Amino acid sequence: MRAAGVGLVDCHCHLSAPDFDRDLDDVLEKAKKANVVALVAVAEHSGEFEKIMQLSERYNGFVLPCLGVHPVQGLPPEDQRSVTLKDLDVALPIIENYKDRLLAIGEVGLDFSPRFAGTGEQKEEQRQVLIRQIQLAKRLNLPVNVHSRSAGRPTINLLQEQGAEKVLLHAFDGRPSVAMEGVRAGYFFSIPPSIIRSGQKQKLVKQLPLTSICLETDSPALGPEKQVRNEPWNISISAEYIAQVKGISVEEVIEVTTQNALKLFPKLRHLLQK
């Protein structure tokens, strides 16, 4: 394996998505050719846990697994709903089964979009599901890979209240001032290729110190073009845009963000050296 410091780490992607069922080998080969050294594969629901673990075996040391229960469950767009504690109860025994092989717990978090969490009860149940998963991560000494759509401040507040330490806030959509509260708590923020079409993400990157930034694609979502399948090799778009905003070289962005990923995910260094 190449030295951990020289390649790109995609800190958040959905390789178990049906979008990749037909050509995942090709997609991953393209990523390797684009100097991607690790893909952090996150889960949304218990139904994809086995698939993610199988991918991590098949692409050992390249696809690194995270298991967790996302705040939005069900299939888009018609059947999506806010998470319940029952969803978590189904997932927990499977997570326990694989705990020693996990890089992190994720994708977990809060999603207060009105169509998913229109009531106080739904928001509270999301909070309870997140609290239990933060407690699980702490017990297993694992980082958390976090979703916070329309819930930036409540998510950061809850993470702090629960004493979460190693935290990645993926594709953060809140205000830079709220993100800076996360920076002060030692959290990292991962930036997807959709930054090239998002004024909010561009403002965020201007404010965030490079030492708090990681790279992600969120593949197959959040690509450079809307409605076009995103792929891990597009991660270079994030690196290039951050370099442009910060007025530094792409090489420096890659080096620092990969070092950040190694700090965030302690198991990563060992896995990259396999």
Curated annotation (Swiss-Prot):
Q: What class of enzyme is it?
A: hydrolase
One Pfam family cited in the UniProt record for this chain: TatD_DNase
**Highest taxon of the source?**
Eukaryota
GO MF annotation list: metal ion binding; nuclease activity
> How does the cofactor attach, per the note?
Binds 2 Zn(2+) per subunit. Exhibits AP endonuclease and 3'-exonuclease activities in the presence of Mg(2+) and Mn(2+). In contrast, in the presence of Ca(2+), shows AP endonuclease activity exclusively.
- Cited function: Exhibits 3'-exonuclease activities and apurinic/apyrimidinic (AP) endonuclease (in vitro). Show preferential AP endonuclease activity on double-stranded DNA substrates and 3'- exonuclease activity on single-stranded DNA.
Task: Tell me the protein family, please.
Answer: Belongs to the metallo-dependent hydrolases superfamily. TatD-type hydrolase family.
Protein's name according to its UniProt entry: Deoxyribonuclease TATDN3
